[in-house]
Amino acid sequence: SERPKRVFNIYWNVPTFMCHQYDLYFDEVTNFNIKRNSKDDFQGDKIAIFYDPGEFPALLSLKDGKYKKRNGGVPQEGNITIHLQKFIENLDKIYPNRNFSGIGVIDFERWRPIFRQNWGNMKIHKNFSIDLVRNEHPTWNKKMIELEASKRFEKYARFFMEETLKLAKKTRKQADWGYYGYPYCFNMSPNNLVPECDVTAMHENDKMSWLFNNQNVLLPSVYVRQELTPDQRIGLVQGRVKEAVRISNNLKHSPKVLSYWWYVYQDETNTFLTETDVKKTFQEIVINGGDGIIIWGSSSDVNSLSKCKRLQDYLLTVLGPIAINVTEAVN
């Protein structure tokens, strides 16, 4: 199905309010056709990101390799009521306006609802889930145990993510809600150094319509790394935007695809993207059917006067001019 033609918007999701103490207000952002929250609030009228909101079950790492359980540790052991109550408290505290009509971003990255995808620092949730079943059924073989662990984990992971989204939508009806980073693609990773998404992940995305059907916006992350070649950086963006657009096209309501983009290299956060990388990654988002870009920044990008000045300079000389060119060309 053809995607609805939408205005291509670029959003500012950078905590530059931290620069106000140095009398740097970043008012120039809006001169470049970039949508910014009024007063440069971080959680504001245009966009609000909520980091690890509520009380999602999770195993939180402590210093000595140990971890502590939060709300049961894994979704199948968690208490949904506690979580949802805390979620609304967080929302009301951070952004009390019930008429919020911007983009609401839930940034939850402790585990993924697809059991297989919990690797790296998420793997403890997988191991913990397997241990729970093994303790219950000591005579079962490894395969049976893993299958059961996977089934339980995925059922309740879905429950937590879905109910959270529904509650967000119910209490902030006019906002466009989505989870940061989804759909995942796992391209340009050490085992998959190609633009195309991991095939298994694409099948798993197809099975996640329960999530995407409830989202008004898809928010793939297209942060690039310096260790990649310039062509690989473009490939990373291409594959991730394409996959999100593919998912959107398969849904009746064709949610918007807004790509999360960071102005520094993910593996070299003191280095701004080159002008060429900015141009090419922005173009790639447009070419592959994206509906916009969310420029993200970390608080550690703006926690000193010199960093604030550097970012402002970069905005005025590189990022801003490219942003206005792209929006004017597309719209």
From Swiss-Prot:
Active-site residues, record numbering mapped to chain: E109 (proton donor)
Any GO molecular function: hyalurononglucosaminidase activity
Glycosylation sites: N79, N99, N127, N325
Expression by tissue: Expressed by the venom gland.
A GO CC term assigned to this protein in UniProt: extracellular region
Signal peptide: none
Family statement drawn from the similarity comment of this UniProt entry: Belongs to the glycosyl hydrolase 56 family.
Protein name: Hyaluronidase A
